[in-house]
Amino acid sequence: MTQDSALLQAPEPMLRDGSNSRKVFIKTYGCQMNVYDSTRMSDALARDGYEPTEDMEEADLVLLNTCHIREKAAEKVYSALGRLREMKKKKAADGREMMIGVTGCVAQAEGEEILRRAPAVDVVIGPQTYHRLPEALRRAQQGQRVVDTEYAIEDKFEHLPIAESRKIRARGVTAFLTVQEGCDKFCTFCVVPYTRGSEVSRPVSQIVEEAEKLVEAGVREITLLGQNVNAWHGAGPRGEAWSLGDLLYRLAEIPGLARLRYTTSHPRDMDDRLIEAHRDLRALMPYLHLPVQSGSDRILKAMNRRHTAAEYLSLIERIRTVRPDIALSGDFITGFPGETDADFEDTLRLVEEVRYAQAFSFKYSTRPGTPGAELKDQVPEEIKAERLERLQALLLKQQQEFAESCIGKEIDLLLEKPGRMPGQLIGRSPWLQSVNVDAKASQIGDIIKVRITGTGTNSLFAERAEAAV
């Protein structure tokens, strides 16, 4: 459903009492990019007088920003919409209006089907068109039911406001910043190319402007996001071709920006410039999420990953050569169609060789519309589950060993939020671990030197080593 971009600048509607004050509740499912998208939607809706709330009961608008990556994702959304239908009906009986919107990747995949199965829904907006959300809501208020999932011609980021400094400050000292969307890799298990579209990179100037505004508002650490973030490309100040490494060098020049991270990467796009950035940039944290999915060349080929296990291991060796302290994270799928016991053992061997600081692992789930769904030799669920249990036990063991190896180390800790105990603050280590420290004289946003003293279930403990830096 195409629209004139001029509609995006429509005047703000007023409530019956003459005010613009309304409440929006946004439920975010899935990845970090959805978290980022939810904040941008919230900022766009602020122009129309919507204030965010964490209480769904008081919301005039409820948005479900959805994820389609796992099996039964759509059914979970329909289940939530059933509960919202009852809430909407109850509010209507009390003389209160509530609008319901579905955004994100389930919205993109399901489209009109959502309106058919969930008649209480007013608006369905895809991830490439959520800049049109305010206008879609205006139309819904006039009685229309809106579905907008066609890929926009216009650059959505040009139509999205960046939040005021006070709102950025309230969100904390770390922030996400999407620099790339979509994927052209077409891994046979993945829905991303179908829900997020082809790879698109934001221009350098737009990224730098947003990063500078985040830092001006007090953000100390920025994580660059993309479905395939290291496929980002753009033009430098003289029109020269830039890759993600070049962008990181540029962002590292921003005064006050202490830390940089990026996720999620594909092994095929880890070029020399990006590896050099890991070597040279103090601001680029020694942590890399680099999914491999399997250690079997036969399964990697069936997944259309376009690299071998040996090539992945060689890449890891190159990165560790320039940044010996780097911590590695990965993604794994057990039970991909045709996976044999021997294939799975190859995965375990790769994990043993890499030694991950943390990793994410899942059973293969059939995604309608993907090539993997059409493959023969689907693996029985009980075998998928047994392999996943074995893999997760190994990964957990490695995670615990990495955490224990940190004991006694002095590190720079970015303080992010208060802890549970008086005087306690929680920060993130360079390797993305949560760290608890007694830091009464420090403030959130400080980077202090601490010494790791112990490990918890999902965190580390530390004592202060010296004054803030």
Curated annotation (Swiss-Prot):
Cofactor note: Binds 2 [4Fe-4S] clusters. One cluster is coordinated with 3 cysteines and an exchangeable S-adenosyl-L-methionine.
UniProtKB keywords: 4Fe-4S, Cytoplasm, Iron, Iron-sulfur, Metal-binding, S-adenosyl-L-methionine, Transferase, tRNA processing
Cofactor(s) required for function per UniProt: [4Fe-4S] cluster
GO CC annotations on file: cytosol
Compartments where located: Cytoplasm
Record domain MTTase N-terminal: where: 22-142
Function: Catalyzes the methylthiolation of N6-(dimethylallyl)adenosine (i(6)A), leading to the formation of 2-methylthio-N6-(dimethylallyl)adenosine (ms(2)i(6)A) at position 37 in tRNAs that read codons beginning with uridine.
Protein's name in the database: tRNA-2-methylthio-N(6)-dimethylallyladenosine synthase
Protein source organism: Rhizobium etli (strain CIAT 652)
Gene from which this protein is expressed: miaB
